[in-house]
Amino acid sequence: HLPRVRAPAVVPSLLVSRPVFLHPRTVARYPASLHNARPEDCLLVRLEALALPSVRAIGLACRPLHDPAILVTEYLRHSLQYRRLLMRVPLTADGYRDRLLDAMASLLVDLHRAGVYWGDCSLANTLFRRDGGTIQAYLVDAETSETHAALSDGQRAYDLEVLVENVAFGLADLASFQ
């Protein structure tokens, strides 16, 4: 007996994700080349083992000699994309934007301490969970990420430069809709 599958409405995002409800859990699937999907799957498994905030890899579906593969992750319950989070609460809300940025900064610090170079830190590659007045950021796209015994100052600086540029772009893009 196969589980009941229902396709929900697709949430607009730069990252093409297709959530699928498989009773009793929900998974997200991301098409990617096998060349990129295999290391991303391994990295997500490593992040889970290190108890770092990220989506949980379930597996990789591929057919020999065919691309794209499908990276399957557990859907992060009660999480929101930054667009949904900030569309509900304006950027000008008292301290809200600062808490969101603090959550991203904390995530990046945790990743760097564990020797993880993100490579594409952005609002679009992050999911957020609210819990009262706090916000927790989760890495959702690890396609460009790498793990090392320790990061060099240059790797940390470049990751931070990418974060600043991508977050500024994401916030400017969002402000144009408000």
Predicted regions and their residues:
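Conserved ATP-binding subdomain of kinase catalytic cores across diverse folds
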Residues: H1-L86, P90-D94, D98, D102-G119, ...
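A general structural signal for short secondary-structure junctions and capping/turn motifs
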Residues: R63-P64, R130, G154-Q155
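Residues immediately flanking
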Residues: Y75, R130, A142
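Short, glycine/acidic-enriched loop or turn micro-motifs at the edges of active sites
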Residues: R77, L123, T144
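Hydrophobic residue at the +6 position relative to the catalytic HRD Asp in the kinase catalytic loop
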Residues: C121-F128
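Activation-loop N-terminal segment of eukaryotic-like protein kinases
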Residues: F128-T134
